[in-house]
Amino acid sequence: MRYLCRAQLLSLLLLPLLKARLSVPAHPIPQSFLPLMISTWNYTDANREAWTVLRQGPRRTRQAVIQGCLHCQNSNSCGRLLGGHSAPDSSGGITLEAALIDGANMDYGAVAGMAGIRNAIGVAHDVLRYTNHSLLVGEAAARFAEAMGHKKEVHSLSTTLDVLLPWLLGKCQPNFWRNVRPLANDSCGTFSPLPQEQQQREMRQEYPIEPGHHDQVGFLALDTEGHLHAASLSSGARFRIPGRVGDAAVPGAGIYADNQVGGALATGDGDVLMRFLPALLAVEALRAGQSPASAAEAVMRRLLRHHTEFNGGLVVVSRLGVYSAACAGLDEFQFVVSGESSGRSMRRVEGIKCLDRHEVVTGGPRGNFYVVSKKIWAAGGEDVLVQRVEKITLNEGVDSREFEEEYLEDKDAEIDVDEGEKAEEVRSLLDESPGDLLLHQLGLAPPFPFRFPFIYF
């Protein structure tokens, strides 16, 4: 028993060293550097606007984060999607969502799916101030906004059509449907559910986050007295299904703050963020005694274990102004930091490299992988997707990036069969009849025929 205790102690001491290559370093901000303003992505103008308000004195955190959102929603300095009505849903509707949280008393106000009102963050502020609710949505949110004095506006139809028409002419690709007919990869609908026996194994299509084309931004302000506010603003995912609510409006998904411990901003695939509430998880990790760096990495690893294809980032700030970040699926995750020391202001764009999702999930590729290299159609009752499968065996220690470059370039899709009964089933079928294989019969085929990055199930 004594030996086991020593081994456990040794492993605990060595764990930070073993994880050092993946860790994201914390950036301590001395007390004299407070107040502190952090915003996601590299939108320096919006951060500057928020910082101008924050540095006016204590208890300006709420107005500071609101000012940052106002700058984004009233200009194109935070990208076309946020300021230019360029993120319609699949029916051409333009809606906004926003949220605001007070770290002193946990008051929260948010709106989602709100059309015709530009000042989404202002309406969210009114929900926080004038109601006992936390979230209003849809047409009712717009009516509430008008009752609070916000003017209804007509969005630019030409700007929306410039985005929507090419998408419609391209058979509505990409979209957010799956397991429907007609096939979502080749049609704009109207869709209906596929019979249960024809539905494919669940697999997400992740859309890349392009620099300067972000549909969500978050702001977090901390003053010298320890007051925290966080706010978020989003135009929603482009070509989303009408009625969809995003992470920017959901408590703990995009933003969270608690004066007692700190706050967090999360951004990326909103549908994944809403399932895990990473901003809340990060703040609770701080409460449990973790540093911002370890909290950010732990939360990101948790997301990746369940959604290996996730793209996004997370910034975590302690109540003392120490901050760190973690990300996945991006070349680099950037955020803007402003602070003050001895009357002198500083502002910088921070950039971090993301975790290697392959190593986070599996420690590197090994075992049997099946690369779908060709798709053909065969008739029989109903059309059936036949996929030609190439068997590839990797030994332990093969570098994941080398594997991608050598085997996966220009492939239509890739899948990894988990160890277990289904994997054995696939192996036996391949041994008996290598070549064409009806993967859908085993429930292993991805949705047709989107292109996928290298994905671990």
Curated annotation (Swiss-Prot):
Alphabetical keyword list: Disulfide bond, Signal
Listed as disulfide-bonded, the cysteine pairs are C72-C78, C172-C188, C327-C354
Highest taxon in the source lineage: Eukaryota
Instruction: Fetch the InterPro entries from UniProt.
Output: Ntn_hydrolases_N, Peptidase_T2
Q: Name one GO cellular component term.
A: lysosome
CDD domains, from UniProt? Glycosylasparaginase
Q: Which Gene3D superfamilies match?
A: (Glycosyl)asparaginase
Tell me the GO molecular function terms. Answer: N4-(beta-N-acetylglucosaminyl)-L-asparaginase activity
The signal sequence is: 1-20
In terms of SUPFAM superfamilies, this protein maps to: N-terminal nucleophile aminohydrolases (Ntn hydrolases)
Q: What is the similarity comment for this entry? A: Belongs to the Ntn-hydrolase family.
Protein name from the UniProt record:
L-asparaginase-like protein GL17509
Question: Which species is this UniProt entry from?
Answer: Drosophila persimilis
- Please spell out the taxonomic lineage of the organism that makes this protein: Eukaryota, Metazoa, Ecdysozoa, Arthropoda, Hexapoda
